[in-house]
Each structure stands twice: as structure tokens, then as C-alpha cells.
Amino acid sequence: MAVLEPELFEQHYFTIDDDKKPVKDATWAKSENKAYKEAVIADNGGKDCLSVSEYKACALVTKRLKNDFRGHISLEPAVKESSFYADDWYGDEDGVVNVKIRPDFFKPNLLGDVKSTKSPDPKGFYWEFFKYGYDIQLALYRQVLRDYGHTIDKTTILAVGNGAPYCHEWYTIPEDILEKGKEKYLYGLSRIVQIKNGNSSDKYGIGFRDEDDFIILDRY
């Protein structure tokens, strides 16, 4: 929210100083401190509570984005955090899959997502991008939005560091990567249909081995 809708941030979050803990040398998990924190949250209308360091980090990220012209181009104006439902979106007479997406933001010709990451730099985020299947996610988001009649020509990610110094970077996703992501989600959806219909018992892939070779799924 600090990134997408900073004007609403204060309405949903507040901060409490560690010095306010009844038991100073204990964490907030200690019963006395936990009870105090829950009471403060109730007094603040159920807002989410952030530590002072978390609150300052959010403020820093917001300030930096305000000074980044790419943020103004991408985020303002844009539709933010809206859900789209597509019933019977994939499948045939043998079975269908319903789809729900919730893109962080989009506008005419642009789809975008915000990702918290340990490594917002190009080398580090490249690894995380494929590890967590962001190519699959964004390819699916783009197709559903297009099915809703939205023109999406450019797909981008805002990668925000989740640790000091909380740097950020914008990345445009190439078309060939999105097409590969589409192949992956189509394959995944086809597997879901097969498993739902009982046409496949291969629910865990082609094999699995844990770190200690304790269990191996045999394929005959």
C-alpha cells in the first residue's frame, strides 16, 4: 500500500515504539507485551501495527518512488488491486478451470506488479523472477485482462528491496519470456483438469527425492 496507494497508508497502519513495551527487555511475543499491543491496536480501530523501523522503511520507499519519474508514468493514473474472475476460462467438455487474478496495477497498454525482493538488482532479481514463476503469473494476468477487453502491450515489474537500503528498480518483461510463461500456465492448467477428472495420478511431477534420500517416488 505504501507503494501503490501512499495516500491511504496512514488510514490502515500505525506505529508503536519499542519503548512502550511493559517488559522492556522482552519481545512483543511476551504475554504482557502482546496484550498491551493488542489493546493499542484495538484503540486504533484495528489498524495494522508496524515497528518504527518498518514504518520508516515504508516512508523511505514512498519518498523515493515519488522522485522517480518512471513511477509517475506507470502508477498514475492506474487501476490498482482490482480482482477479475473468469469462470470456465480453461478446459473443454472433460473439465474446466475457473481463474481469478488481482494485478497490482494496470492502465491502457500497461500491466504492472510490485514484488518485494532480497535482491532488486538485475542479476539477483533475474534469479528470483524465474524461481517464483513471475513469468507464469504475469502471462496469465495479461491474457485475462485482454479477455476483459483491456489493451496490454507492455508488462512491467517494480522490484522493491525488503532490506536496507530498500532500493527499487523497474523491469520490462520481454515478449518471448511472457510467451514461455503462457506455455507454462497452459500446461499447468491442463494438468489440473486431468487430475480433477481422475485421468492422471501423477500429482507430484515426475519424481521427488528429499535431501536425505529418505523417500523416492518410483515411476514404473
Each language-model region and where it sits:
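Metal-dependent nuclease catalytic cores that hydrolyze phosphodiester bonds in DNA/RNA
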Residues: 1-100, 206-210
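Residue-level signal for well-ordered alpha-helical scaffold segments within enzymatic catalytic domains
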Residues: 2, 6, 110, 140-143, ...
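Hydrophobic/aromatic-lined pockets within catalytic cores
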Residues: 4-8, 116-119, 146, 150, ...
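Short histidine-centered catalytic/ligand-binding loop motif
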Residues: 46-49, 123-133
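Secondary-structure boundary elements
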Residues: 70-76, 107-113, 146-153
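Coil-to-beta-strand transition motifs
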Residues: 98-100, 107-109, 152, 164-166
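Conserved catalytic cores of phosphodiester-cleaving nucleases, focusing on short active-site segments
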Residues: 101-127
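Metal-dependent nuclease catalytic regions and adjoining charged, substrate-binding loops involved
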Residues: 128-135, 140-220
